[in-house]
Regions:
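Acidic, PIN/NYN-like endoribonuclease modules and their adjacent C-terminal/linker elements
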Residues: 1-3, 112-144
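Metal-dependent nucleic-acid phosphoesterase active-site entry motif
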Residues: 1-20
Length: 144
């Protein structure tokens, strides 16, 4: 089954109605959920960042609701970095000033797992070779 990573910017925006990208993020999440888009890999770092942001802006109940929905949905896959990917993430963080540590870990995971597609609104990823950032509900595996 094809997969793509999902960044905090998309996950948070979909869950938080006041986010300026909420209406753009919803079709991405719905497409993942209904199978018109590839399954989503959610790194544990991304999940933590998203849940912390939701707790701050929308409250604990909203964060728990999102966590439950992600865990219960077979199209969302929570993954952790391997030791090698973590080492790569630290190196990328040191080398690429625009990337946050979580973003560097996303890139490292994608490189070590051979994944090229990332749903993200953060254009800092555009500076990284072999990462194809998707900012709309586009299926990169469907040529039609």
């Amino acid at each position: 089954m094809p997969r793509a990573l999902i960044d905090t910017t998309v996950l948070f925006a979909a869950a938080y109605r006041r986010d300026s990208s909420h209406e753009t993020a919803l079709p991405v999440i719905r497409g993942i959920d209904n199978g018109t888009l590839p399954g989503a890999v959610v790194l544990d770092y991304v999940l933590a960042e998203t849940l912390n942001g939701l707790t701050t802006h929308a409250g604990h109940a909203a964060a728990v609701d999102l966590l439950d929905r992600i865990e219960e949905n077979a199209r969302f896959h929570i993954e952790s970095l391997s030791t090698d990917a973590f080492a790569t993430g630290k190196s990328l963080f040191r080398l690429h000033k625009p990337l946050s540590f979580v973003d560097a870990c996303i890139v490292a995971y994608m490189q070590t797992e051979g994944l090229g597609y990332l749903y993200a609104f953060d254009d800092d990823f555009d500076a990284v070779d072999d990462i194809y950032r998707l900012d709309t509900a586009t299926n990169p595996y469907d040529p039609s």
